[in-house]
Each structure stands twice: as C-alpha cells, then as structure tokens.
Regions:
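Short acidic-glycine-tyrosine-enriched beta hairpin
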Residues: 89, 103-119
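Extended, acidic-biased charged interface segments
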Residues: 134, 138-142, 146, 150-151, ...
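A short, N-terminal "cap"/entry segment at the start of jelly-roll beta-barrel domains
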Residues: 1-65, 156-190
Length: 190
C-alpha cells in the first residue's frame, strides 16, 4: 500500500479526463477513456427477446480491469451456462430467478449475493411473476476468456449449448438478435 503523499509530483499533477457521453436514440453511450457519471435509466441498453436487457456502460471500449452491468430478466429469459477466466459477482436487487451453478439449481430472490471464483460455470433464468434485476461485476484481469459448457440442469431451462464452445457468437447463434434500446419505464425498481 502506498502512503499518502508518497507518490510525488507525478500523481499530484495527473488528472483523469471526463469521458464524453454521446446521446443516441438508444440512450447515452460513453466515448473513450475517462471517468463519467451515468444514470442507468439514461444509458443505452442492449435487448434480446431471449436474453433480456442489460446496460451498456462501456460503449465500444472494453474496460480492461472490471466489467459491470445491470441485467434484467423477465420470466423465462436467460443467459447461457458458462464459466469465465475471471472472478464474477452478482447481486439480485429485485425479483426472482433460478441460478444454475456447477450443475445445481438455486432459487434466488432480492438481496441474494452470488460469488463465482474463476471458471465457476453458471447462468441465471428469470422466474416469478415479474422482472428480475441483477447487478453483475466481473474481473477482466488477464483478458476476457469464456467457455460455454453443456449441462443437463441448464438444458432444462434452454440455457445450455449443444456443444462446448469458447465463441460467444457461436453459443448465442440460436438466440434472437441483440439491439440497442433506450430504457423503458418499469424495467428498474423505483
């Protein structure tokens, strides 16, 4: 740990610029590196009929250290069973979902937290009678790497690939197209 005042004049003279937020029909999209403040309701979202919708806080840049998003799953919407190179953590903020993790099912509700060390295979499926909101964070240290795995428990929910792959495009090829969208009222809790 570096003590305060020990970084010297280089740190004191350094400033991190504010990133531009570009307004589009689908919401605000960060442009370039730098800090920014962006309300999730103003952000651009990525939607799929099968996979739900999630925030696009990164824009076209891919953050190198940490991925962060809010995903909303309506009942029956789901991701695909997979494991990633980096640690991932999830917090269910509202609603209900089923977590398939290492071949086992767990029912989750608001304020349940899930910790996945690297390569923990998992996916979420929306359940209940309304949307499920999940805050997701994942390490990108060492680069992004993913494997979509075949799993019987995930297959019961339509959330398993038919053949193992490390290609997101290949894994999700049977799902509907993703499109950018502006926030719709009611997606997030008040």
């Amino acid at each position: 740990m570096v003590e305060a005042g020990k970084l010297g004049s280089d740190f004191e003279a350094m400033t991190v610029p504010e990133a531009e937020l570009k307004r589009t029909d689908a919401g605000l999209i960060p442009q370039g590196e730098g800090w920014f403040v962006l309300n999730a309701r103003d952000a651009s979202w990525i939607r799929s009929e099968d996979r739900g919708q999630d925030t696009d806080f990164e824009g076209r840049q891919e953050w190198t250290d940490l991925g962060f998003r809010i995903q909303i799953l309506s009942p029956g919407q789901r991701g695909l069973y997979h494991g990633e190179r980096g640690q991932e953590d999830f917090l269910v903020v509202s609603g209900e979902c089923v977590l398939v993790i290492e071949g086992e099912e767990r029912n989750l509700k608001a304020w349940d937290f899930v910790h996945c060390p690297p390569w923990t295979k998992h996916t979420f499926i929306g359940t209940g009678d309304g949307p499920c909101v999940i805050v997701m964070a994942g390490s990108r240290a060492g680069g992004f790497e993913v494997v979509y795995a075949v799993d019987d428990a995930a297959a019961k929910h339509g959330a398993s690939v038919l053949e193992e792959t490390s290609s997101p495009d290949e894994a999700y090829s049977r799902f509907g197209e993703e499109k950018r969208s502006a926030y719709s009222e009611g997606w997030l809790p008040s």
